[in-house]
Amino acid sequence: MSDSAARPTFLFHDYETFGTHPALDRPAQFAAIRTDDEFNIIGEPEVFYCKPADDYLPQPGAVMVTGITPQEAREKGVNEAEFARRIHDLFTVPNTCVVGYNNIRFDDEVTRNVFYRNFYDPYAWSWQNRNSRWDLLDIMRACYALRPEGINWPENEEGLTSFRLEHLTRANGIEHSNAHDAMADVYATIAMAKLVKNAQPRLFEYLLSHRSKQKLMTLIDVPQMKPLVHISGMFGAWRGNTSWVAPLAWHPDNRNAVIMVDLAGDISPLLELDSDSLRERLYTPKNELGDLPAVPVKLVHINKCPVLAQANTLRPEDADRLGINRQHCLDNLKVLRENPQVREKVVAIFAEAEPFVPSENVDAQLYNGFFSDADRAAMNIVLQTEPRNLPALDITFADKRIEKLMFNYRARNFPGTLDEAEQDRWLQHRRNVFTQEFLNSYAQELEMLYSQYEGNAEKQALLKSLFQYAQEIV
């Protein structure tokens, strides 16, 4: 079958990780299943583990959640270079839509960083060869807000609707016995996709077709400030993660971001304050604002599959159910249209946004910039070179990050290729990571959790494993 004829497929996937930071923590386990466009499973389930390198210790809290120890990952896993290659092979099958649950904010960032550390293009998998990505978390939020019929919506302890995968599966009678095992979460995500597709087929098809930025662009009319309904976790569960918004302007530097006003908010700051005061207030944490109204502005990134729809998609009875005051939103829209000078103010907020302070650590430098075509081509040569021949590889890179990435890549994945001077350099790097201060606070955290889980033999065994692992590698 030629690429052009490749049937569209969904690749449902999930990572379990050794910590919450996509760049500085490491993956533990990856799972994926390919389905056809009706969500029938068509491929073998893929599950593999990643061996942690010897310059990293897992976050204890993450191991408490996943139950995966570094010893288990080391025993069952492949090195990160091989781990990245396997994932890249799955993700780059033409016409694949890579889908997960909260993947836009988390798993996709893990993928980008794994690919960045291992010389694969961090972005191409999600757009080349008619590929795309999609996130079921916002689909569930949209379904609850816009068309809730046909699905049971569980509540959390605070009485708010819960969108945690394990809560939704339980409420809807879906088998999900081993939450936080990557494969169990993948099966659960497929089941949720089927549930929404069957309960609300029109909404489902609409959201699926509007996952691309090209399609979303057709909804956004900045000159008219055309109102839209927008679903986002940023709005908070207390109003169903939903509001009516209007586009004020495109972001001055990021062509994938549109500056939206939350019409349900208090727009007085936009009218009364200058751009410097607005910027300061926008970047002040909510809990420090006191009685001051927040700036009701948010960026919507059209390359992150945001949920946007025509304003009338939010029916009056659903707006009432979510506690959204339609008249207040309409009044705000009228005022904003009468005060177009607000547009320049909000553009000015973002034209001099918070400065991006680059990290000294190359692992955290993915977003410092794109690699040139020449560097990309050179990185492909690295991937095609036998590990044992890497030391003799004579290529120069323009981007300063790549030499450091290359050294880390060899030291973490192929330590046998380091000469004596390089081994000393790596040892020094590990000493810089595992300072006495770091190790003391790590031991303290393990002790604190150990007493917290008194009487829980399973959790305490995990903590003992972490303590042993730290002693082994440091």
PLM feature spans:
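C-terminal non-catalytic accessory extensions
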Residues: E422-V474
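Metal-dependent phosphoesterase signature
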Residues: T66-F83, L90
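Acidic catalytic cores of enzymes that act on phosphate-bearing nucleotides/polynucleotides
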Residues: N198, S209-L289
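Short strand->helix junction
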Residues: F18-T20, A73, A179
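Entry/capping segment at the start of metal-dependent catalytic domains
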Residues: M1-N40
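Metal-dependent phosphoesterase core characteristic of DEDDh/y 3'-5' exonuclease domains
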Residues: D25-A28, R34-T35, N40-I68, D89-P201, ...
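Long, charge-rich C-terminal accessory regions
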Residues: P252-H429
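Short secondary-structure capping/turn segments at boundaries of alpha-helices and beta-strands
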Residues: E16-T20, V47, R86-I87, W244-P247
